[in-house]
Regions:
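A structural signal for multi-pass alpha-helical bundles of membrane permease subunits
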Residues: 4-8, 12-247
Length: 247
């Protein structure tokens, strides 16, 4: 039976491995191709005459004397000062994630332990708010920001991104808190802890996987945002995504 099962599973294993390898190639090709083209001159990578120029670097060799060149990176990071956009992105993402996780952890724990029906409706309102198009929410901030001279600065963009990401963090962390037994809170209180001490010293250590997971999603949402950052930031304070779109 074992030999028959192994013989029957061998074609399936080959088919599964082949599918995974093909899928990896298809998914990785755009990134590898873009990375390869970044070391070529524009005439090679965007050549309409012969796509093989992007491979052999014919024009790159003529213009630079080599098959590869780092002129594109120098032009972007030094001449166009792309490092400013990278620094702005790091600042925006860091504060957005920290504030979102802090408020989401406190709010999610409170809603999970409240035991009242209004907790469900608050989460539903948050979900509706999260489902609204970002461009609709941002347009409501533009006029006040212009009147109060707040437009174009990083703190205002961080506030808006936190407001947009907060419903998501509430939902995620609330669901994680629901999976933690309330007996842990009660045991901590029996040992003399207050509600906040039980939350800090007992619940949070158990919640770290959920906090890290939610933080990763919040990081991706803030890092990849285009609508908010492109509309609320000036050219000098742009993050990486709108800066890349402007090249």
């Amino acid at each position: 039976m074992t030999s028959r099962a192994s013989k029957a599973s061998k074609p399936l294993m080959i088919a599964s491995t082949s599918f995974v390898l093909i899928w990896i190639f298809v998914a990785a090709f755009p990134f590898v191709w873009t990375l390869w083209g970044s070391f070529k001159v524009q005439g090679d990578f965007f050549s309409k005459a012969d796509w093989r120029y992007a491979l052999n670097g014919t024009r790159t060799a003529i213009e630079t004397g080599g098959l590869f060149t780092g002129a594109g990176y120098e032009g972007a990071w030094v001449q166009q000062e792309f490092w400013r956009a990278a620094l702005n992105t790091a600042i925006v993402v860091l504060f957005t994630v920290v504030i979102s996780l802090t408020l989401g952890t406190l709010g999610g724990y409170a809603l999970a332990r409240s035991g009242h029906n209004y907790a469900f409706w608050l989460l539903m309102i948050a979900l509706v708010f999260r489902a609204m198009p970002h461009i609709t929410l941002v347009s409501g901030y533009l006029l006040p920001f212009f009147e109060w001279n707040l437009w174009g600065h990083l703190p205002t963009t961080i506030i808006v991104l936190v407001a947009i990401n907060q419903p998501f963090t509430l939902w995620m962390l609330h669901s994680f808190f629901l999976n933690i037994p309330k007996d842990l809170d009660e045991s901590a209180k029996v040992d003399g802890c207050t509600q906040f001490q039980a939350f800090r010293h007992v619940i949070i250590p158990v919640m770290w996987p959920g906090v890290i997971t939610t933080g990763l999603f919040s990081f991706l949402l803030a890092y990849n945002d285009f609508a908010v950052t492109s509309m609320l930031l000036s050219k000098d304070n742009q993050t990486m995504v709108p800066a890349i779109a402007g090249f």
